[in-house]
């Protein structure tokens, strides 16, 4: 049978582990998987674009497990009281093709995105970084803030969003963390002045130039998260030209990332090579580094495996007959049309 993790179960799982420990453990798992980069069968995500958003499938596999994520991006959804990003994913056994996990990934995507940002910053930011600007205070902002506060030593966050209510929500959600100071800014320029790290996590599908070259200061690390599809950017092109730029999966980032603005031969560095020690990350304390983060399927593979391990360990989730299993005659599919006496087979793990 297939493990099934719905939103309430994922919520319970994250609460049981703790948001910050979840992100920290996941960042370590991501680092391990990025270090075995060449073991994976990789491809860019398959995207279906419309005027109002995008729907994507993100596949990846190694020799034992295949994973994919279904995810959307619809920036105007909040006006209809809907989420901008929603996702679910599957982890399957390569030997048999059977799905071993069907899971919600909306909550988990925010966690894995924060964990990926953390993993990159641990490798690229200056070790004495203590102050971060957080531009875009929507659904993913708290996860990014906690990742950098709990695991990188960020003590002060200067927050800015075009919607003041989003910033108020961020501050309210994180008020219990006494070691973290969150201050409002009235503009992007005010938010980024004097910080060590800039995290941009905005949602508008537009060629935006939220961060401009005049805002850069020596030694900054930029964690550019929001630009993740064609026609959607956050950084002025000259910001990239004045920085050392790191990417997840270059063929995908060339299409969807900040570097879509630049020629195809603009030099970038594979993050996995830095993590493996094959190439340099930050080359000096004064260098500006950019993590051009678009989100890659390997990160979803990692979070699906982590969720399955943690759910099994805690006896959480349900098991469902998503496909016919071993007790059925594999040559008699027609028997499944007889209704099985109307019984729906869903079994709570614990």
Curated annotation (Swiss-Prot):
Keywords per UniProt: Amino-acid biosynthesis, Lyase, NAD, Nucleotide-binding
Designated name of the protein: Ornithine cyclodeaminase
Family under the similarity heading: Belongs to the ornithine cyclodeaminase/mu-crystallin family.
Source organism: Pseudomonas putida (strain ATCC 47054 / DSM 6125 / CFBP 8728 / NCIMB 11950 / KT2440)
GO molecular function: nucleotide binding; ornithine cyclodeaminase activity
Binding positions (L-ornithine): 45, 69, 112, 228, 294
Catalytic activities: L-ornithine = L-proline + NH4(+)
Physiological role: Catalyzes the conversion of L-ornithine into L-proline with release of ammonia. Is likely involved in the L-ornithine degradation pathway that allows P.putida to utilize this compound as sole carbon and nitrogen source.
Enzyme class: lyase
Pfam family, one: OCD_Mu_crystall
Gene: ocd
EC number(s) per entry: 4.3.1.12
Cofactor(s) demanded: NAD(+)
Pathway: Amino-acid biosynthesis; L-proline biosynthesis; L-proline from L-ornithine: step 1/1
Assembly: Homodimer.
GO biological process: L-proline biosynthetic process
Active site: residue positions: 228 (proton donor/acceptor)
Signal peptide region: none
């Amino acid at each position: 049978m297939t493990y099934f993790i719905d939103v309430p179960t994922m919520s319970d799982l994250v609460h049981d582990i703790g948001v910050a420990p979840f992100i920290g453990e996941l960042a370590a798992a991501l680092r391990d998987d990025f270090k075995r980069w060449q073991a994976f069968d990789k491809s860019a995500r398959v995207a279906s674009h419309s005027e109002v958003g995008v729907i994507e499938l993100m596949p990846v596999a190694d020799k034992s497990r295949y994973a994919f994520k279904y995810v959307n991006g619809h920036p105007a959804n909040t006006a209809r009281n809907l989420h901008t990003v929603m996702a679910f994913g599957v982890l399957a056994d390569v030997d048999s093709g059977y799905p071993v996990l069907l899971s919600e990934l909306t909550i988990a995507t925010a966690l894995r995105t924060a964990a990926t940002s953390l993993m990159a910053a641990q490798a690229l930011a200056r070790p004495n970084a203590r102050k971060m600007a957080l531009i875009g205070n929507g659904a993913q902002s708290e996860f990014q803030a906690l990742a950098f506060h709990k695991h990188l030593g960020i003590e002060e966050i200067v927050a800015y969003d075009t919607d003041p209510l989003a910033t108020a929500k961020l501050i309210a959600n994180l008020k219990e963390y006494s070691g973290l100071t969150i201050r409002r800014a009235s503009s992007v320029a005010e938010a980024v002045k004097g910080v060590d790290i800039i995290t941009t996590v905005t949602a508008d599908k537009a060629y935006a130039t939220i961060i401009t070259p005049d805002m850069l200061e020596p030694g900054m690390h930029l964690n550019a998260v929001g630009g993740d599809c064609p026609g959607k950017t956050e950084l002025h092109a000259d910001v990239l030209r004045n920085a050392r730029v790191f990417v997840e999966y270059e063929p995908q980032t060339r299409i969807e990332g900040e570097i879509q603005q630049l020629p195809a031969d603009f030099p970038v560095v594979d993050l996995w090579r830095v993590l493996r020690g094959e190439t340099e990350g930050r080359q000096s304390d004064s260098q500006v580094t950019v993590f051009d983060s678009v989100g890659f399927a390997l990160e979803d593979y990692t979070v699906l495996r982590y969720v399955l391990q943690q759910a099994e360990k805690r006896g959480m989730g349900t098991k469902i007959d998503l496909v016919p299993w071993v007790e059925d005659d594999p040559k008699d599919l027609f028997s499944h049309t007889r209704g099985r006496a109307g019984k729906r087979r869903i079994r709570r793990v614990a």
